[in-house]
Amino acid sequence: MQQLEEVVASALAKIAEATDNNALEALRVEYFGKKGVFTEQMKALAGLSPEERPAAGQLINQAKEKAQNALNERREALTTAELAKKLAAETIDVSLPGRRFENGGIHPVTRTIERIERIFGELGFSAEYGPEIEDDFHNFDALNIPGHHPARTDHDTFYFNPTLMLRTHTSGVQIRTMEKQQPPIRIIAPGRVYRNDYDQTHTPMFHQVEGLLVDENISFSNLKGILHDFLLNFFEEDLQIRFRPSYFPFTEPSAEVDVMGKNGRWLEVLGCGMVHPNVLRSVGIDPEKYSGFAFGMGVERLTMLRYGVNDLRAFFENDLRFLKQFK
């Protein structure tokens, strides 16, 4: 009995002095393992008489339980202390400002497209869209562009085969609209177009917005009035605007529109003209009854003029230092 009390006292003292879970594990093996102190005590019961065994066994179990409880409590205390130490080392100062997540911005080209759509929407135009892979008829034939025209050469057009290509303008949308809708027609056609060119003012892919108005008694003065209103609204300035004669196979007469730049020089901004009678005939519209005008503008060029950008390629290089200026 006295020896058992000494065993328990020794076990409790060692458990109390343990400083980590590894030390506690060693004590568990020492006292409760297969060859542990309490295991040996239980084996020693075999040497007692049958009358003595129950009482002795009860004492050993009580001593074992006392030591086991002390071991469990110490393990829990050490685990709690270790967790508290870890949490203290990883403490977050909740009073500090959080990480700053920057909101994205609308790309300047997208801004320009949305601006153009809004202005023409206020002028009564609706936006129409069409396929970027276009056939020969909608991209060329229906627009009065003959087979010998330079625009049909491989130098300007990305061909899939002799009759299928990446569209070189959004004029095909105008043709498709006139095929399915009789006048009055009042649309713009924004979208991506493709031409085989790459330099400071050209990229193989760029954006265009083309417009079409077809109705009875439409004249060139109607065209001038619409474009004049658009340019003044787009640039938000009382600009000098001029129309000078030009040539496009799908309009007659044709003109190019210039605005006076801040440097005192004229800057070309778009092309336009009265829809050629052959174009109206190709889609089943009587040119004796209806007339119309069309216009087209490069979105990137307008964006460059509006924001003072010198190199068109900057819009497609994804340089955040450049793009953040337009947020």
Swiss-Prot record:
<dbReference type="GO" id="GO:0000287">
    <property type="term" value="F:magnesium ion binding"/>
</dbReference>
<dbReference type="GO" id="GO:0000049">
    <property type="term" value="F:tRNA binding"/>
</dbReference>
<dbReference type="GO" id="GO:0004826">
    <property type="term" value="F:phenylalanine-tRNA ligase activity"/>
</dbReference>
<keyword id="KW-0460">Magnesium</keyword>
<dbReference type="InterPro" id="IPR004529">
    <property type="entry name" value="Phe-tRNA-synth_IIc_asu"/>
</dbReference>
<keyword id="KW-0436">Ligase</keyword>
<comment type="subunit">
    <text>Tetramer of two alpha and two beta subunits.</text>
</comment>
<dbReference type="InterPro" id="IPR010978">
    <property type="entry name" value="tRNA-bd_arm"/>
</dbReference>
<keyword id="KW-0963">Cytoplasm</keyword>
<keyword id="KW-0648">Protein biosynthesis</keyword>
<protein>
    <recommendedName>
        <fullName>Phenylalanine--tRNA ligase alpha subunit</fullName>
        <ecNumber>6.1.1.20</ecNumber>
    </recommendedName>
</protein>
<keyword id="KW-0547">Nucleotide-binding</keyword>
<keyword id="KW-0067">ATP-binding</keyword>
<keyword id="KW-0479">Metal-binding</keyword>
<dbReference type="InterPro" id="IPR006195">
    <property type="entry name" value="aa-tRNA-synth_II"/>
</dbReference>
<dbReference type="InterPro" id="IPR045864">
    <property type="entry name" value="aa-tRNA-synth_II/BPL/LPL"/>
</dbReference>
<dbReference type="GO" id="GO:0006432">
    <property type="term" value="P:phenylalanyl-tRNA aminoacylation"/>
</dbReference>
<keyword id="KW-0030">Aminoacyl-tRNA synthetase</keyword>
<dbReference type="GO" id="GO:0005737">
    <property type="term" value="C:cytoplasm"/>
</dbReference>
<dbReference type="InterPro" id="IPR022911">
    <property type="entry name" value="Phe_tRNA_ligase_alpha1_bac"/>
</dbReference>
<dbReference type="InterPro" id="IPR004188">
    <property type="entry name" value="Phe-tRNA_ligase_II_N"/>
</dbReference>
<dbReference type="GO" id="GO:0005524">
    <property type="term" value="F:ATP binding"/>
</dbReference>
<comment type="similarity">
    <text>Belongs to the class-II aminoacyl-tRNA synthetase family. Phe-tRNA synthetase alpha subunit type 1 subfamily.</text>
</comment>
<dbReference type="InterPro" id="IPR002319">
    <property type="entry name" value="Phenylalanyl-tRNA_Synthase"/>
</dbReference>
<feature type="binding site">
    <location>
        <position position="252"/>
    </location>
    <ligand>
        <name>Mg(2+)</name>
    </ligand>
</feature>
<dbReference type="Pfam" id="PF02912">
    <property type="entry name" value="Phe_tRNA-synt_N"/>
</dbReference>
<dbReference type="Pfam" id="PF01409">
    <property type="entry name" value="tRNA-synt_2d"/>
</dbReference>
